[in-house]
Amino acid sequence: MATAGVAPASGIVDVNASSAIAVDKLPDEILGMRIKDDKEMEAHVVDGNSTEAGHVIVTTIGGKNGQPKQTISYMAERAVGQGSFGVVFQAKCLETGETVAIKKVLQDKRYKNRELQTMRLLDHPNVVTLKHCFFSTTEKDELYLNLVLEFVPETVHRVIRHYSKMNQRMPLIYVKLYSYQICRSLAYIHNCVGVSHRDIKPQNLLVNPHTHQLKLCDFGSAKVLVKGEPNISYICSRYYRAPELIFGATEYTSAIDIWSAGCVLGELLLGQPLFPGASGVDQLVEIIKVLGTPTREEIKCMNPNYTEFKFPQIKAHPWHKIFRKRMPPEAVDLVSRLLQYSPNLRSTALEALVHPFFDELRDPNTRLPNGRHLPPLFNFKANELKGVPAEMLVKLVPSHARKQCSLFASS
């Protein structure tokens, strides 16, 4: 199929991760509308379904709107992730030598695949690119959708684990880079596309270890959240699950992604999960240990239908005591703004981007520890900046970076 804009790579599930992968139990949520006689959904079907190393898959792309057809061959190299959704494997394009990730999921023939529909809408430097897709069949006549994605070699999860094993703190510049790019990807999907990711976690944040550019992946749980329409609450991996989800809310907002981003930032700073709950209920206990018992008003903000109130009264633990003594106060402040019980009191992704914690990234003299330049951080497109107040715009795009920003370049 024709190249679509940017999108996730991998519903990579790290089998060593201790958190539960709740979204894998929700196939009905992942598959959206019924398929009609839709030209857009046409894709070449290839026989065979092997992902064993050395297996070659041949498919064709193009052939629509006057485009020439092109044959592409992929050789499977190794599995890089698996779950009940299917498998993600690394492959090499034999024609170009390019390495890609192919996410293969069982496709219900009655429905469109929501992940594919979402990914076709996406085009952003901090979201993994969907190159094209094709269907494959097995001897049992099972149909699989194969998403051919940009390959990014590392995950934030593995980077955190690397520093943890070395008994070292992650350099603060990397914490800033990763969390800034997470917020930028969320600002884009929330404001420009109108989609909530619903499974933000370190395993779904891919990193190029040389440039430290971060890309959000795995849109298997992503959904347009419409006000007044119910959604499932059993979504998002446990350690990163917003409290309104634990309270069973079904009319939540994209603020659930902001909570998850706050949990990831806390984990980057601590070197371990901020709220490591052993179960859904225990997850809430871990949150209460830090934020204190939510007030009746806060519970009402999270889930108006929740009537039980049987929690022990625990005072909030000061954030600065959660982190090491020399932790910059700006880091602690940003965590506290992202991790609010009331969803409407959490910072938005755009508000987070202009937080003083990221001021170092806006300094034109800032470099990576190896002396190299930072990855592109301010190459905003016009749709990313639409409706942004002037005072925020000035902070968002520093003067030295305005040439690479389309809005300023055209003015």
Curated annotation (Swiss-Prot):
Residues the record marks as active site = D199
PROSITE patterns recorded: PROTEIN_KINASE_ATP (PS00107), PROTEIN_KINASE_DOM (PS50011), PROTEIN_KINASE_ST (PS00108)
Q: What class of enzyme is it?
A: transferase
Q: What is known about the tissue distribution of this protein?
A: Absent in leaves and petioles while a moderate expression is seen in the stems, roots, and nodes.
GO terms classed as biological process: cell differentiation; signal transduction
Q: Name one Pfam family in it.
A: Pkinase
Residues the record lists as binding ATP: V80, G81, Q82, G83, S84, F85, G86, V87, V88, K103
The entry's protein name is Glycogen synthase kinase-3 homolog MsK-2
Q: Which GO terms describe its molecular function?
A: ATP binding; protein serine kinase activity; protein serine/threonine kinase activity
- Which family does this protein fall into? Belongs to the protein kinase superfamily. CMGC Ser/Thr protein kinase family. GSK-3 subfamily.
Q: Which UniProt keywords apply?
A: ATP-binding, Kinase, Nucleotide-binding, Phosphoprotein, Serine/threonine-protein kinase, Transferase
Name the Enzyme Commission number(s) assigned to this protein: 2.7.11.1
Q: What is the lineage of its organism?
A: Eukaryota, Viridiplantae, Streptophyta, Embryophyta, Tracheophyta
The Phosphotyrosine modification is found at: Y234
Where does the Protein kinase domain start and stop, copy by copy?
A: 74-358
- Organism whose genome encodes this protein: Medicago sativa
On the tree of life, the source organism's domain of life is Eukaryota
Q: What is catalyzed by this enzyme?
A: L-seryl-[protein] + ATP = O-phospho-L-seryl-[protein] + ADP + H(+); L-threonyl-[protein] + ATP = O-phospho-L-threonyl-[protein] + ADP + H(+)
Q: Which GO terms describe its cellular component?
A: cytoplasm; nucleus
